[in-house]
C-alpha cells in the first residue's frame, strides 16, 4: 500500500484504523502464571498510552508486548533471572519475590523436596538416593568425612542426619574418631588385617575394629533347627522352663555383638528388656522356636522392639534350649548307670554267667525222713560245679554229696 498521495493527517488516520483492526483480529497469547492465575498476554500497544517495560524500564514502542505478573514487558526482556532463558515462546513462567523464573529453575530452587546435603531442590524426573526420611542427589550421597560416593549396595551408617561410610562409622562407634580421619590409613589397616587372616593369625582380622556391622543383614540360623529325640514326654517342657526361667525383678540383657569378636577396649552394647516384652517373647517361644518374618513383624509391633533384636533373642533362646536338653540327656544316662550298679549284677566272666543260669540251684535242700520223725534230720547239700551240664559225660559220677550228720 502506498501512502505518498495522501496528506499527513490522512495517513495517520489510516494507520490508526489499521492498528484498531489488527488489535481486534490478532489472537491473544496467554499462559497461566503459577500462584495467581495470572496471564502472560501479548496484546498490541495502543497509540493513546505509553507503557513502561518492567524489565529494562524503557518505553514500549513495539507493536506487541508481553503482560506477566500484571506488568508489561518487552518481548526480549521477559527472561529467567537464573539461566537467562527467553520466555517469549515458553508456555509458563513463575514469579517469586519479584523475580521471574523458568519452570526448571523454579522447581530446582523452590520445590518441596530438597537435597539433605546441598539443600537444593530436586526435580521430579531426577534419580535420588533415600536414607530414612531424607533424600539426596546421586552426587551428594557421600561420606561426610572422606567424601566417598556411596552407591546401591554399599554399607553406610547415619548419625545426626549425617552419612558415613562403613569404615568411618565403625570408628565413630568405637569412640576413637579423630577430627581429621585419614581414609587411606583405615584402608591400609583393613588390608593388613585381611593379610593376617589369610596367614592364619586368627579370625579377628575379618573385623579390625571389633565392632558390629549394622547393615540390616542378620546372622540368624537358616531354616528350622534340627529335631532331637526327647528322652521323656515332659522333657521339652522342663528344658524350656529351665532355659527361660529368670527373676522377674531383674532385667535380662541381650548381647548384640555376640557373633563378632569382641575387643577389650570396646564396651559391649546391650539391650534391656522390660517385663511385658519378656513375657510376650517367652509365651511365643513356647509355641514356635523359630518364627518367620511375618511372626517377627507381629512381635515387633507388640513389643516395640526391632526385628533384629527379636531374631537374636530367639537365637539365644534356642541355644539355651538345646544346651538344657543335652544336659538332661547326660543326667539321665548317669542315673541309669548308677541304678544298674546298685542292683548287684554278677561281675564274673560271661561263660560263668551262662553256666550258672543253666546249672541247678546251689541253695541247700533239706530232706526229712517221714518214716522216723524222731530221727535227726538228714541234710544233703547239692553243690553245683561250674561248667556246662551238656558237656558232662553220661557215665560221670554225680556231683551231689550226701552228708550223714549222725
UniProtKB/Swiss-Prot annotation:
Domain commentary: LIM domains are necessary for transcription activation.
Molecular-function GO terms, alphabetical: chromatin binding; DNA-binding transcription activator activity, RNA polymerase II-specific; metal ion binding; RNA polymerase II cis-regulatory region sequence-specific DNA binding; sequence-specific DNA binding
Q: What does this protein do?
A: Acts as a transcriptional activator. Stimulates the promoter of the alpha-glycoprotein gene. Transcriptional regulatory protein involved in the control of cell differentiation in developing lymphoid and neural cell types.
The Gene Ontology biological process terms listed for this entry are: anatomical structure formation involved in morphogenesis; axon extension; axon guidance; brain development; cerebral cortex development; dorsal/ventral pattern formation; hair follicle development; maintenance of epithelial cell apical/basal polarity
The protein's matches in Gene3D superfamilies, at most eight in alphabetical order, are given as:
Cysteine Rich Protein (2.10.110.10), Homeodomain-like (1.10.10.60)
Protein name, per record: LIM/homeobox protein Lhx2
Instruction: Give the intrachain disulfide bonds.
Output: none
Oligomeric state and partners?
A: Interacts (via LIM domains) with CITED2. Interacts with POU4F2 isoform 1.
Gene Ontology CC annotations of this record: nucleoplasm; nucleus
Changing residue 56 to A does what? Reduces transcriptional activation
